[in-house]
């Protein structure tokens, strides 16, 4: 928010954009950072263990409030343990799926390429784009943003609390998040689906498997019932860590709007309640709300990125930084 406030030559314009960004960040924290994650946890546990969504929502809401009441130190400690655990679980699982079905990998990749570039798909995609191009772009961009949050400016809020004297070094470290999320995690997910042979399979109702149900089928085909448990646990850890991290980002935006930190208790309470609502609401409503919030949040941040591009280039060239691994 303060970057936006000071980035523009006209301070009043910067202040307006900073306030708008803070408002949209608070809304996005309830949407993408909270409700969609709670919905993913509830779906995974319902499909795998048959747990009622209301029960899952209550547990998520209670645990969220208990963690965030401890402040940034408690949030940092929880995510410090959750993130490595979820990464190891998921990377191990997808790696084993690819290794076990490695002989199917070439045909699986070929199936993806043929499905994307065959004449029927190209004709259908072209007609669909001509008829509803904006909707096609909307889904493509929104899912990409949901994957790595690039362009939203949310990660900068968390990076700002890092104890480092060098902004360039911190910027390099923050950039790795997009690479890990999209190139590593998403690529392994796609390769696991391609090699498992579950791509294009249908459920008992005749519907194509997709999303969480597809990945559960992929893990189940390799590990059996244990694979379903492994994936459900991975999704729960991924999603809960995201809920906790986004709470801090939304709280800082709320604090900027309120002018002090005394009123953040109301935000924390509402945040825990929305985690419950996300678990019990329909998936379509949750996604629509999240997409709107993400789009609104990105606009002022991207304006600041353009305005500060020369300053960033100058800082990068004049202040070389050695990254210590």
Region annotations inferred by a language model:
Residues 21, 38-45, 51-60, 64-114, ...:
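Membrane-interface loop-to-helix entry segments
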Residues 12-27, 58, 123-147, 184-186, ...:
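Select transmembrane alpha-helical segments in multipass membrane proteins
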Residues 93-111, 122-128, 162, 176, ...:
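Extracellular/periplasmic helix-exit of transmembrane alpha-helices
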Residues 1-11, 199, 203-222, 248-257:
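Flexible loop linkers connecting adjacent transmembrane helices
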Residues 12-19, 165-178, 261-266:
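Membrane-interface alpha-helices at helix entry/exit sites of multi-pass transporters
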Residues 315-321:
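Conserved small/polar residues in nucleotide/adenosyl-binding loops
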Residues 67, 144-149, 155-167, 174-178:
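Helix-loop junctions at the membrane interface of multi-pass solute transporters
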Residues 5-39, 43-67, 233-243, 262:
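Helix-loop-helix module between adjacent transmembrane segments
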């Amino acid at each position: 928010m303060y970057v936006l406030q000071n980035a523009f030559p006209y301070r009043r314009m910067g202040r307006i954009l900073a306030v708008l960004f803070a408002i949209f960040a608070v809304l996005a924290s309830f949407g993408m950072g909270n409700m969609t994650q709670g919905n993913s946890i509830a779906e995974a546990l319902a499909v795998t263990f048959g747990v009622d969504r209301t029960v899952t929502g209550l547990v998520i809401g209670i645990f969220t409030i208990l963690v965030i009441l401890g402040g940034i130190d408690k949030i940092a400690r929880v995510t410090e343990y959750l993130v490595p655990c979820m990464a190891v679980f998921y990377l191990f699982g997808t790696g084993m799926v690819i290794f076990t079905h490695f002989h199917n990998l070439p045909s699986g990749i070929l199936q993806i390429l043929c499905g994307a570039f065959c004449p029927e798909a190209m004709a259908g995609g072209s007609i669909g784009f001509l008829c509803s191009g904006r909707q096609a772009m909307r889904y493509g961009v929104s899912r990409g943003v949901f994957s790595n949050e690039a362009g939203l400016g949310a990660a900068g809020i968390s990076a700002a609390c890092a104890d480092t004297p060098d902004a360039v070094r911190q910027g390099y470290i923050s950039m790795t998040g997009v690479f890990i999320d999209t190139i590593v995690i998403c690529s392994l997910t796609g390769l696991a689906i391609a090699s498992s042979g579950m791509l294009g399979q249908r459920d008992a109702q005749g519907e194509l498997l997709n999303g969480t149900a597809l990945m559960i089928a992929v893990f189940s085909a390799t590990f059996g019932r244990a694979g379903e448990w492994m994936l459900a646990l991975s999704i729960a850890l991924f999603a809960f860590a995201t809920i906790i991290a986004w709470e801090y980002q939304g709280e800082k935006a709320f604090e900027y709007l309120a002018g002090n930190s005394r009123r953040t208790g109301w935000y924390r309470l509402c945040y825990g309640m929305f985690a419950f609502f996300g678990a019990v609401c329909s998936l379509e409503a949750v996604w629509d709300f999240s997409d709107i919030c993400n789009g609104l949040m990105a606009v002022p941040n991207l304006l600041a990125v353009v305005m500060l591009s020369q300053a960033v280039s100058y800082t990068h060239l004049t202040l070389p930084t050695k990254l210590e691994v």
